[in-house]
Amino acid sequence: MPELPEVETTRRGIESSVVGHVIHELVVREPRLRWRVPRNLADLADGQRVQQLRRRAKYLVFDLERGSMILHLGMSGSLRVLPRETPLLVHDHIDIVMDSGMCIRFNDPRRFGCLLWTEEDPMTHPLLKSLAP
């Protein structure tokens, strides 16, 4: 499982590729992760600018203009910044394609990670509200 320093390193590594950019397309190839990815997530996220990328414990929070995506890497997950046309690997489950043409690709062999949506303050979400920073 990625530990806190790895999650913070991941946040810092992808931050400049997402903050200030618009989500051009969100592609979910495998919705059956730890919790099912919301069916309408692409509709909710597409076209929204990422305002901020935060970390709360081992969760990454993508603050958008109208709502937030909450991501956990799970036991074996990773996020990579790639050109969209990069060939897929076996466990590449989600692509967050940015207006820059770059893609944030979520790979999770064990599928213990998650990508969730909230329109409320994400810090009050049941998964986050009792966690320390």
What residue ranges belong to the model's regions?
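Extended, highly charged segments
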Residues: 1-56, 61-65, 97-98
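Phosphate/anion-contacting hairpin/loop surfaces
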Residues: 69-133
